[in-house]
């Protein structure tokens, strides 16, 4: 969930809908590097966290560093990790969404910044559960110029899990593509990092039951610890939710 404002009424119904569909974890963005504040929508964020906890869900908060201002990125990441809701709830984990390339155009400098950010993030939050949301290996196979030498292995010591953005619909909107890319991205990310992998799927607006079924089966077969589609607002078809609930089994 990221497309909301600071009115709790804009996000609480989304959380309720997720819970009603059987989702066990809510993923929600805390802010962006261009936002005016470290927590962009604190009222809505707190309301979403409280609603999710009331419904027995886990909640992961994420922030996308741009690496052009290291202190800002670290400060905003820590603000998300330390955030406490009006009812005293805290997030279960934090996701560093490491994909933005325009903040530091030079590949080598950006890679060094991503590693430094990850190291300092862990140093500042030694007991937090941290995940790295990353460009999937198959994406860099077909577009290596996006981020040459993406530092999967170098970042691995600082994270508990990796979450590749396995958006197979950018390559093909069919079950075979969903199956192939999902399995390859789980296996390759595990090989590169040595860490558990939670494979993200999508884009939800372009998928059907067959694609999602293939995605779920491939993810489970390859050893992913979980999964879900990006994003909730565009996950419209009931039959898609039926397939996604297989992750809960």
Predicted regions mapped to residue ranges:
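Short, acidic/polar
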Residues: 2-20, 70-87, 143-155, 182, ...
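Aromatic- and acid-rich polysaccharide-binding/catalytic face
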Residues: 28, 91-104, 147-179, 230-235
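Boundary/entry segment of secreted carbohydrate-active catalytic domains
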Residues: 1-24, 29, 65, 132-134, ...
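Aromatic-lined carbohydrate-recognition surfaces of secreted/lumenal glycan-active proteins
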Residues: 1-3, 57-70, 114-149, 193-206
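Substrate-binding cleft of secreted/luminal carbohydrate-active enzymes
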Residues: 159-175, 188, 195-249
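Aromatic-lined substrate-binding rim segments of carbohydrate-active enzymes
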Residues: 28-64, 104-132
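Hydrophobic faces of well-ordered beta-strands that scaffold small-molecule active sites
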Residues: 26-28, 59-63, 94-96, 130-132, ...
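Active-site groove signature of glycoside hydrolases
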Residues: 27-34, 80-111, 228
């Amino acid at each position: 969930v990221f497309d909301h404002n600071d009115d709790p009424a804009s996000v609480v119904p989304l959380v309720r809908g997720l819970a009603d569909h059987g989702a066990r974890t809510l993923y929600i963005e805390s802010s962006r590097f261009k936002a005016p504040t470290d927590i962009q929508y604190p009222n809505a964020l707190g309301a979403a966290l409280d609603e999710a906890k009331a419904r027995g869900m886990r909640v992961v908060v994420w922030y996308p560093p741009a690496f052009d201002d290291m202190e800002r990125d670290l400060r905003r990441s820590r603000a998300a990790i330390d955030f406490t809701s009006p009812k005293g709830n805290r997030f279960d984990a934090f996701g560093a969404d490491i994909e933005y390339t325009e903040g530091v155009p030079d590949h080598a400098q950006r890679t060094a910044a991503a590693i430094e950010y990850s190291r300092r993030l862990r140093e500042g939050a030694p007991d937090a559960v941290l995940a790295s949301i990353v460009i999937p290996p198959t994406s860099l196979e077909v577009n290596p110029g996006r981020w040459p030498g993406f530092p999967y292995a170098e970042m691995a010591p600082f994270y508990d899990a990796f979450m590749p953005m396995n958006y197979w619909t950018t390559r093909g909107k069919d079950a075979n593509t969903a199956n192939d890319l999902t399995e390859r991205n789980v296996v390759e990310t595990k090989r590169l990092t040595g860490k558990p992998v939670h494979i993200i799927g999508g884009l939800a607006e372009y998928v059907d039951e067959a694609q999602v079924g293939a995605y779920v089966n491939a993810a489970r077969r390859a050893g992913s610890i979980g999964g879900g589609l990006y994003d909730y607002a565009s996950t419209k078809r009931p039959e898609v939710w039926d397939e996604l609930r297989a992750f809960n089994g």
